[in-house]
From Swiss-Prot:
This is Recombination protein RecR. Keywords: DNA damage, DNA recombination, DNA repair, Metal-binding, Zinc, Zinc-finger. GO terms for biological process: DNA recombination; DNA repair. The keyword Endoplasmic reticulum does not apply. One of its GO terms (molecular function) is zinc ion binding. Residues 77-172 form the Toprim domain. It comes from Legionella pneumophila (strain Corby). Belongs to the RecR family.
Length: 197
């Protein structure tokens, strides 16, 4: 396989990029944006080498702890649990939450072989106890897997003195947090509901 074909194939690993889109990107870079293409390659290499997960919340960072976990001005008694770093970014862009985060890196899905340990629920419980969290906001996209995950988290924390709430309605069923506008996220956070199981 030649360099052109390898690059087209490599770009297809991105979500929503099929063979035609990948080919258009490659031709555009080669014909009009060679310097930017080299810059893109350099940025990708640096990101893949240096970005890892925050030891406390699992968000992306180049350090041991991410900037959100290091920030002393954030409310350390309030913890927002999300599925992915993209959800952290979406909530931060809404400017409606000043607490800390915990990124599950997925949700419980037996069909995909993901159980409570695979998404970090024991680490979540340890964090809640260690940091004396008073409220956990479950900000998971509405789906069957999310409801299963919410149930497991509630069971995991049933003996702890912590309030558990989840985002209010307004987030469409099957919708992903990262694609919602800031007003919808802000409204869902403000109108979150306590979970009674």
């Amino acid at each position: 396989m030649d360099a052109l074909s390898r690059l087209v194939e490599a770009l297809r690993c991105l979500p929503g990029v099929g063979p035609k889109s990948a080919q258009r990107m490659v031709f555009h870079l080669l014909q009009h944006q060679r310097q930017r293409g080299l810059h893109l390659a350099s940025c990708l290499e640096q990101a893949m080498k240096h970005i890892s997960h925050c030891q406390q919340c699992n968000n992306y960072t180049e350090q041991t702890l991410c900037t959100l976990c290091q920030n002393p001005n954030r409310d350390s008694t309030l913890l927002c649990v999300v599925e992915s770093p993209a959800d952290v970014s979406a909530i931060e862009q809404s400017n409606s939450f000043q607490g800390k985060y915990f990124v599950l890196m997925g949700k419980i899905s037996p069909l995909d072989g993901l159980g409570p340990d695979d998404i970090g629920l024991p680490k979540l419980k340890e964090l809640i106890i260690r940091e004396k969290i008073q409220e956990v906001i479950l900000a998971l996209s509405p789906s069957v897997e999310s409801q299963t995950t919410i149930h497991f988290i509630h069971q995991l924390l049933k003996d702890e003195t912590v309030n558990i709430s989840q985002l209010a309605h307004g987030i469409p069923s099957g919708g992903e947090l990262e694609f919602l506008d800031g007003n919808t996220i802000s409204s869902a956070l403000k109108n979150r509901a306590v979970i009674n199981v």
